[in-house]
């Protein structure tokens, strides 16, 4: 390969890593915010402690909210030169050979040179079709519609630019939001990343799961005694509750 020419695999890996970073960040910011409110509403001692340091917590909550909308804007940006969800899916659909069994075997061989299990492993690997990529594109398009219908305007007019001149106008925009819808949107981005990662790294069919997304459901998962690996949103919920528990004087 010529110097300076980036391979399709390297481009896809780069875009996938950007998407991982941004989708995780969106989950961290959102679930820190919603977990804070859920936890504070449940406990008088915590509310009292928070109110004693109201300036700090208002600053932190404002930062979570601003950062969430900014990172969602990055993910759904339509500029093809930026690191976006569109660019990630374009790299995948335009370079299907990177998902072939041969390409998977080469990647596994680089990771584990000298092993003899790879040949048998890749025989069962899933090779995506155009229908698979079209399905992923439809899924992403549906999520984009949710973002653009309500949340894009808030991102542009409230957080990224000073396009709103009054509190009344700002409140009118936020009145159109739905916290459950926003939770589903953010969690779905992580599931899309997981589907693409499993396809590329392990040769598994890209399936979008429907995981728990409410704070209550994530709290129940956190109390399980099995050895499951927590999602970023579950970890954020658990850590937020743990931090706020320090205020509990009851």
Outline where the language-model segments fall.
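Histidine-centered, metal-coordinating catalytic motifs and their short helical/loop contexts
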Residues: 141-168
């Amino acid at each position: 390969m010529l110097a300076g020419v980036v391979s399709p695999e390297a481009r896809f890996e780069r875009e996938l890593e950007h998407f991982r970073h941004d989708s995780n960040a969106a989950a961290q910011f959102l679930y820190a915010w919603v977990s804070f409110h859920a936890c504070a509403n449940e406990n008088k001692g915590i509310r009292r402690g928070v109110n004693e340091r109201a300036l700090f917590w208002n600053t932190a909550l404002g930062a979570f909210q601003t950062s969430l909308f900014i990172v969602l804007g990055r993910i759904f940006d339509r500029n093809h030169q930026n690191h976006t969800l569109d660019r990630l899916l374009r790299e995948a659909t335009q370079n299907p050979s990177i998902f072939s069994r041969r390409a998977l075997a080469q990647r596994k061989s680089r990771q584990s040179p000298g092993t003899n299990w790879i040949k048998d492993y890749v025989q069962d690997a899933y090779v995506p079709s155009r229908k698979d990529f079209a399905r992923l594109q439809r899924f992403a398009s549906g999520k984009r519609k949710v973002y653009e219908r309500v949340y894009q305007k808030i991102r542009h007019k409230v957080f990224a630019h000073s396009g709103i001149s009054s509190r009344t106008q700002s409140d009118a925009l936020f009145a159109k939001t739905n916290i459950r819808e926003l939770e589903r949107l953010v969690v779905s981005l992580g599931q899309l990343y997981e589907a693409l990662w499993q396809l590329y790294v392990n040769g598994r069919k890209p399936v979008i799961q429907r995981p728990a997304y409410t704070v209550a459901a994530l709290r129940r998962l956190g109390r399980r005694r099995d050895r499951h690996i927590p999602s970023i949103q579950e970890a954020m919920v658990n850590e937020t509750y743990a931090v706020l528990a320090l205020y509990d004087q009851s």
